[in-house]
């Protein structure tokens, strides 16, 4: 069974990567700036950084993947949308790359986000429709993934979110934490996750519904920082250190400066993940769940999307 599954996935891998490369070539051209929009509507200046646990920091940015993590950004005249997904690594024991499932989930979210009717107010709908798209295929990609979507309605500058699992986002205003998403877990290191299983019966996997995602609404203002990331960041870098690092970039709108901030967070997460004596957020979670963990960080794939709210200047 496993060899059959692996053979099918190899063909799907090539097809999916080819499709993603085509859509990446168009999307990366507008990665930091918004769609045309109405004059004066706020927009997001956005940057992305990450690294695979097994490879270098620039391992797969062009494919919108860092290891089993995947991401997307989308800009239209009505909405700015960002998303991250973390493929659940346990499937690797069956020869299945959950990064493919995460990639396809983000691909469809990006696709639906570009519809003219989408105005950023219902990111949960993107998640529901994308998951349904994957499950509805005759021979779907198999795997599991967390997902976090954040969208900005450009007309009223209100942020809407849908977060399922232990990826997440936070908002910083005036150097202080304004909001942080709620983590959703079944147990220690067992996040809520969207899942597609093979035709064979699988009883030992979590299969959560996208409707379980935590949804929030938050008015934003010029200069607010929005950080979206997988647990490779949040499991290794304490919230206080994230806020301190990003506080230096409050009000910054130059893409180069934001990229420097994102780079710093990713390097910090990587260094702390391999520190054996550091009391990481992951180690503290283990203690809270009364799980025997020797301490230190948690080596993992890391994906960070950092954005700031900007308003076009009058001529």
Curated annotation (Swiss-Prot):
The name this protein goes by in its record: Protein phosphatase PTC7 homolog fig
Q: Into which family does the record put it?
A: Belongs to the PP2C family.
Q: What is a single molecular function from GO for this protein?
A: metal ion binding
Q: Does the keyword Hydrolase apply?
A: yes
PROSITE patterns, per the entry: PPM_2 (PS51746)
The cofactors it requires, by name, are: Mg(2+); Mn(2+)
| GO terms under cellular component | mitochondrion
Give the catalysed reaction(s), semicolon-separated: O-phospho-L-seryl-[protein] + H2O = L-seryl-[protein] + phosphate; O-phospho-L-threonyl-[protein] + H2O = L-threonyl-[protein] + phosphate
Record's InterPro entries? PPM-type-like_dom_sf, PPM-type_phosphatase-like_dom, PPTC7
* Positions that bind Mn(2+) 1: 86-87
Q: Which GO terms describe its biological process?
A: dephosphorylation
Tell whether Metal-binding is among the UniProt keywords: yes
EC number(s) in its UniProt entry? 3.1.3.16
CDD domains, per database record: PP2Cc
A Pfam family per the record: PP2C_2
Gene3D superfamilies tied to this protein: PPM-type phosphatase domain
The entry's Mn(2+) 2-binding residues are: 86, 231
What's the superkingdom here? Eukaryota
For this UniProt record, give its keywords in alphabetical order, as a comma-separated list.
Hydrolase, Magnesium, Manganese, Metal-binding, Protein phosphatase
> Residues in domain PPM-type phosphatase?
54-309
